[in-house]
């Protein structure tokens, strides 16, 4: 059963009316209601607030990494373990083909349902997950395979065990190694891009965000709690943090924005998956045609960020 957010209530009402019209066999009413639905969707989704975009990024029906992998990756084979400690189910690694092109796909997976969410640790990777991702990146480099990374995490797991096993070192190592991989790398933020947990698989030749995804150094709730000690300031924090694709594109922190279906990826995962696939193929062609892509990646990374000194 579809889940509707509070600002989607009118969409839900019209959808229910369409279903009743179908039961009655009233095709005329169905056609009128569908036109009304399209108009309502365009009206709502063209005027979303940043807080509503955050809600969409976390929508329970939003496609996760495994949904996209199942739809776009053919002849796939999953690879497990980090060769150091364990297999982290919060990060999935596959070898397969996208349009007959052999690729490596690395994704952060949140899981659906209580049992699967626990298995995936709610998409919060441990150090062994990041080391598994690095193992696969080195495999891709050895066999000259492009890499597609799907980012979707609230952040790296903050538990004591993760810290004891070197969470910060694992993330830092990925940043260092992914920056110098000698194969094309393309990363797409499909939902939440939370802090270092997202960055660990977001260093790439091309970094894109889905239209209703977010990318931030901390959750807006965490920011509000730290700066104002007031959870009700979450919407203020969102505006100050500039976490939406549009803001990050303007700041030069991401390369591209991938448009979603009119009702969002959570309403049409097939179209969303196809859009990601086409973006990957286009980006891959662009990178492969550039003999200096490694130098360009380095220059892009070195140009990130700016600061202003004040004499006051």
From Swiss-Prot:
Positions of transmembrane segments: none
The keyword Electron transport belongs to this UniProt entry's keyword annotation: no
Name of this protein: Acetyl-coenzyme A carboxylase carboxyl transferase subunit alpha
Annotated InterPro entries: Acetyl_CoA_COase_a_su, ClpP/crotonase-like_dom_sf, COA_CT_C
Species: Helicobacter pylori (strain G27)
One term of GO molecular function: carboxyl- or carbamoyltransferase activity
Compartment list: Cytoplasm
EC number: 2.1.3.15
